[in-house]
């Protein structure tokens, strides 16, 4: 159990209110664009966005499943079910061919040889994430929309994302713990079931039940990369550390948090003060 208490109805209402205020102030936005992976974060973001666009007649929620090479059939099916149940417009765009050609050129230009090492898988995964964002941002520009981020607070603190590859224009979940992402998702599943919207409930439930993975072909699950067995453990370790408790400082979760600080500070820039100071 997470060591903090969460009121999921309050969080849900606050997301809709805050995001609605943002769209009200930015009336030039005509659509919301989201990449659907079949995972819980993009699924929950899509579900919330489907309710948000109802506040703005004519605004579209455009969903894309963008498999590349290593995505499983199960991931693709889950993404499709979310897209078909919640998006105004949904389709699948396989970018495997584009990725393979791009990566072949990158390898050739840098004179690298193909390998199956862990580091090589990370590099390939980074290129996949960045290629997806190239596609989504181009689509958003064409549709006069904005790309929705799907990251959560746990991923932020662990550096569990690709620089310039996973971040959109606006995020609902960035400061929710991963455990809370699951909790809010289950809250919404229960709401759909209470209204007998079974197809929507089943689509979201399938993402809750799935083994979490980045879908980039680096490992078979998030836990393999993080070094733990569940997200409740991860979140509680991080919560205690952020409160100043030091007993877990050598735990792989905290080591990863500390080592990924450069990501949370990206991009680094020389300050105005440092530029103009007289050092003579």
Where are these regions (language model features)?
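Conserved G/P- and acidic residue-centered "switch" motifs that form tight phosphate/ATP-binding loops
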Residues: 39
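ATP/NTP-dependent adenylation/nucleotidyl-transfer catalytic domains that generate, transfer
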Residues: 1-34, 44, 48-51, 58-72, ...
